[in-house]
Amino acid sequence: NKIYDVKDLSNSTIKDITFFHSKKYEFLASKTKASFCITTENLKHFLPKKCNKIIVDNVLYATAKITNLFYPESINDDFDISAQNILKTSFNKKVKFGSNVLIGKNVKIGKKCSIGHNSIVEKNVIIGDNCSIGSNVIIRNTIINNNVHILDGCVIGKKGFGFFPDKIKNYRYPQIGVVIIND
């Protein structure tokens, strides 16, 4: 079986891997459609027989590691600003860019927009018409609709969900959702 995505118990399909870390979710675990589930020895019996169980000591840690394989942290470390990097990226009329702006693949920027100095717009971001993005802004996994103004220094869609403990230290839980900002 191939795994195509990481999803929660209730939204997973046969192509997904999910996780089950607390008995309070047993009603969802018994109905999951995921082909694979990360869980503990104590919880595995709540899962459907057709679901392949991956038994671990720390479910959240294992899920974070797998999620990072599907959703790498950031493009910032290996950002290539060559012309080939912005294939399939579209800029409409009258878009203004400050200096040192980085634009990822498959970005769509509407009409009459401005993006301030030192800002990063990562791949697959959509920015509507008449938007202004301040300086030193990072945007990831975001849809910005028309007439939105983002102030200097904002970070949108980068980190979320906080931390969870392991035996040695705390780990950041990966963010895989999309932020939608309306006017």
Where are these regions (language model features)?
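Structural signal for interior beta-strand "rungs" in well-ordered beta-sheet cores
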Residues: F19, A83-D183
